[in-house]
Amino acid sequence: MFYDLHVHSCLSPCAENEMTPNNICNMALIKELDLIALTDHNSVRQIPAFAEAAKAAGIRALYGCELQTAEEVHVLGLFASPEEALSLQPWIDERMPDVPNRKDFFGDQLICGPMDRVTGEEPRLLLVSLAASLEETVGRIHEAGGRAVLAHVLDRENSVTNQLGFIPPGLPYDGLEIKASEEKQRVLDTHPWIKEDSTVWLVDSDAHRLVEISERENSMSEETFRRLWGDAL
């Protein structure tokens, strides 16, 4: 199963406005992916339009967001249904600081409706930390029925290793995201408590432009998919 589970839409200010739900799903089809997920910064408000676009395109989808914790660690919350993902929004809203977005500096935060028609904008800046710890964020994702994946774990910005220095043992995450398969050994070499075979490893694009969506190159077995999702899908 070829996938890309870390893609931003035009709701994320750092993404291009071309990243509309239909464009994302159609590019995933062009690139012959089997599974795609939408993961905007600190918001699931693009999920309804994305769910409609994925259904129209006939592509398998997961629904999510990329949450920034109080420690400035990025965590992907992935959900099997739009309803589960949307249930997280009130929790996010309560913990997100009321900082207005400066479109001239950060970019647009566009919310789409049917056929990618822009129906609104998110007025609060999404590139902020929530008033929630890493542990609380992982726990809330689980409570909503989702899976928590530590994003780009070796990046120099907003990764768990950059912000905390290491991946905490005992943290109940469901998967680790790396940017390339060769990063796996670096994680294992520096974290002896992480076992290769019992960990779900994801290689995603973190796409902010259509061209950045993964090619048909990163795959997971049905067994790995079931290990991540169990009977949820």
Where are these regions (language model features)?
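Alpha-helix-centered segments that form part of catalytic cores
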Residues: 108-143
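Conserved Rossmann-like nucleotide-binding pocket used by diverse enzymes
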Residues: 37
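Charged catalytic cores and adjacent phosphate/nucleic-acid-binding surfaces used
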Residues: 1-5, 9-33, 44-90, 125, ...
